Regions:
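Catalytic core of nucleotidyl cyclases, primarily class III adenylyl/guanylyl cyclases
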Residues: 60-92, 106-157, 181, 187, ...
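Cytosolic regulatory/linker segments at or just downstream of nucleotide-handling modules
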Residues: 129, 139, 168-238, 242-247, ...
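A generic structural signal for short hydrophobic patches within well-formed alpha-helices
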Residues: 5, 34, 182-183
Length: 288
């Protein structure tokens, strides 16, 4: 980034290998069912699609002061809070995730009119969805690699957890999933984002369960239906945690009708958090 270049010029430092521990928020995004795009699109079509998608997403990332770590195919790996320190790195990462999802709605709308361009893949392209995961904590950041060829990147347990948030979001029917650490840090900066509690999960390699949340959007953008959905869902979670399966089912059924993402309505969506919790309640009822 231009800020990083300015910082290097001012300090007079040459880039060199090495890392330091820094408080950051790690950000991972991944296109849902990307292998389908690879199989069905021509190589040129795939490159065109990815370039348009990655340009749109990276523009948002940079506008929100994120640092691009790398692209891995369709995936974006980024960090907030390094190399330029930021007090609001958690908030900026969540804000980026929400803005990316909003931008993808616009892209799907645009692609839905480009039937000639995408041919037999038109239906697939116009249903593209992205999952995003974020986690906040201390990571090792710096230049890593070979002596003559290295990359500014991040490493550590908290980075792995951010990646797990992204991949694990699928199990909850969510398209953004963040840790409680990120939620709390984000709210300390600015409390204008709505969140819903999803679950506590024990991640492989960790002993303690981590609370996971879905940012559902900016409060100012939420319609009454979505607000009611979040209220019903929260009541469902409260009853679920008390093992009141019937009470929880009742609330999740109400929330399901109000979900902002519905299969058959929202392109590319096959389930949502309410549907996942309904299934889980039914399993608990049958296997007390």
């Amino acid at each position: 980034s231009s800020e990083l270049v300015d910082q290097m010029v001012e300090s007079g430092e040459e880039p060199s290998l090495g890392g330091q521990e820094t408080g950051i928020t790690a950000f991972f995004s991944d296109v849902q069912a990307f292998s389908s795009f690879s199989e069905l699109l021509t190589p040129t079509g795939l490159v065109d699609l990815m370039n348009e998608y990655l340009t749109a997403m990276t523009n948002i990332l940079q506008e929100e002061r994120g640092t691009l770590d790398k692209y891995i195919g369709d995936a974006i790996v980024a960090m907030y809070g390094a190399p330029i320190p930021m007090d609001d790195h958690a908030y900026q990462s969540v804000r980026t995730a929400i803005l990316m999802q909003k931008r993808q709605i616009e892209l799907r709308e645009k692609w839905s009119y480009e039937e000639e361009k995408w041919g037999k893949c038109h239906g697939l392209v116009s249903k593209m969805q992205t999952r995003i995961g974020c986690n906040t904590g201390t990571a090792t950041v710096g230049n890593m690699g070979a002596l003559d060829r290295f990359n500014y990147t991040m490493m550590g347990d908290m980075v792995n957890l951010a990646a797990r948030c992204e991949s694990g979001a699928k199990a909850y029917g969510a398209y953004i999933m963040i840790t409680e650490e990120t939620k709390l840090a984000s709210q300390q900066t600015k409390d204008d984002i709505a969140f819903r509690y999803l679950d506590k999960i024990v991640v492989k390699g960790r002993k303690e369960a981590v609370a996971m949340f879905e940012p559902t959007g900016f409060m100012a953008d939420l319609n009454q239906e979505t607000q009611d959905c979040l209220d019903c869902f929260k009541q469902g979670i409260d009853k679920y945690l008390k093992q009141d399966w019937d009470g929880a089912l009742s609330m999740f059924e109400k929330a399901k009708e109000l979900e902002p993402n519905k299969p058959g309505v929202t392109p590319g969506v096959v389930d949502n958090p309410s549907m996942i919790l309904i299934n889980r309640c039914n399993v608990m009822k049958e296997n007390p």
